[in-house]
Amino acid sequence: MIYGEVTLTIIDNDKKVKIRKKNTIVNLSALLPLITSTTSTAGSIITPYIQTNAGNIPVTYSVQPYESGYVFIFTGSFSQPSNIISAFLYPSSLSTFQQPIASIVYSREITGVTSIEWAIYVDDATGLLYNALLPNIITSTNFLSALYADDGNTNALLTLGAYQHYVYAYFSDATISKAINYINAHYFTFIDYTTSPSAITIGNNFALQLVPASTGQHTVFYYLWNSQNFTMQFSFSSGSSPLADGFVVCMYATTPPIALNTSSVTGMTNGTLAYGEGNQICVEFDPYSSQPISVTQWNGSGYVSTLLSSSGAGTGTSMTANDIFVLEITVSGTTMTVTVTDVTANKTIASQSVTLPFTPPSYGYAIITARNENDYANWSLVNIVDWYPYSIQIPTSYVSPQLLPITAIFNTD
């Protein structure tokens, strides 16, 4: 579901008066195909703006939780009071969507307008619109919206298609005479990947491989998340000795990723990570180090400070191939605790606590970078339905082989 509301502020007898009206969502049928078909982003970012009959105004934007979803708020002001009859919102999503996402026409001219606030309310179980509506995407880089699915018999990373308000994919189970009682569907947005993510099997577990076991690899995925805490389950089946370079999780960003850092950072074993706007905490787990956890503070300009340094680079942290690991980040007040556990062996791999320089918000974008430089492992996500917020289990009653359509419908109000 997606809908919008426009608030005009006018001056009436030296008093501020607000006029609110629902708007019309337009071009969703143009945005959805762009989300599903974009393979690379533009070379520059166009600032969001509102076009009116009185001229264009640049806007700032923010995102906040609202009911079971989020509201994206675009705000702009006129240099002098203006008379408004129509307006169009251009979010410049994905740096390439240069059409209005919403429009509004008033039955009479509204005089003396000083500012416009345009709220777009989104409740999206796929997470795709949460990732697409804000414009700050790393420029000139790979982009992939995809559906990772499994049914207990097989798994696949599926290309998405779109038609009008529909997003769809086709899942093929080619096994013979096996029951299909469910399909787990997980929508992901990947950017700046060196090698395309893929569906694999590690041991007896279906897995989504983020990077292969080779040098010079990284992959970024991100999502909007309504918690101070973070959990991720992962595994690997092959790699060097010692292993590298693990993951960096940047939490509390106010936007999707805006840049990829590849330079050295004080206290980190490896500085390759994507980050967004706003005050954020980046947690590195790199088993190439004997103390494999570092915690750093970042903002939209880049690195700010090191709160916890990793140590013993090159000595390695013992991990067992094919085991399942849990990376868990919990926050209590300003204390952050990072723990990595081998749940197969029932042992703790690493655990550290650190005091944060600010109390983190209860929502924001989580930006995860998996990376390999000179040493490596095929870092992969497992048990995704247990921890990833944009996961949907669809009950079915079939026997393989089957070709099964998976469809998401986006409604406007």
Swiss-Prot record:
UniProt entry tagged with the keyword Membrane: yes
Domain of life: Viruses
TM regions (residue ranges): 25-47
One Gene Ontology term, aspect cellular component: membrane
Keywords: Host membrane, Membrane, Transmembrane, Transmembrane helix
Chief localization: host cell
Tagged with keyword Transit peptide: no
InterPro entries, alphabetized: ConA-like_dom_sf (IPR013320)
Subcellular localization(s) per the UniProt record: Host membrane
Membrane association type: Single-pass membrane protein
SUPFAM superfamilies per UniProt: Concanavalin A-like lectins/glucanases (SSF49899)
The protein's name: Uncharacterized protein ORF413
Species assigned in the record: Acidianus filamentous virus 2 (isolate Italy/Pozzuoli) (AFV-2)
